[in-house]
């Protein structure tokens, strides 16, 4: 999804550069927060649930 959106912004006029920078700044903190929460839950959870969580995480990414 991210690659497709980047290619779209490139095809647009120079205005896309401004939008791209704004979206990048807003998205980076959101992504960091999601990764942090996922890592914390993984550590607290046991081995069996760990494998199940990884499968769910992969489905979300794709």
Swiss-Prot record:
Family to which this protein belongs: Belongs to the protamine P1 family.
Name the UniProt record assigns to this protein: Sperm histone
GO cellular component: nucleosome; nucleus
Tissue: Testis.
GO biological process, one term: sperm DNA condensation
GO molecular function: DNA binding
Subcellular location: Nucleus; Chromosome
InterPro entries in UniProt: Protamine_P1 (IPR000221)
Job of this protein: Protamines substitute for histones in the chromatin of sperm during the haploid phase of spermatogenesis. They compact sperm DNA into a highly condensed, stable and inactive complex.
Transmembrane segments: none
Region listing for Disordered, in residue ranges: 1-62
Superkingdom classification of source: Eukaryota
Predominant subcellular localization, coarse grouping: nucleus
Keyword Phosphoprotein: yes
Keyword list, A-Z: Chromosome, Developmental protein, Differentiation, DNA condensation, DNA-binding, Nucleosome core, Nucleus, Phosphoprotein, Spermatogenesis
Phosphothreonine sites (modified residues): 9
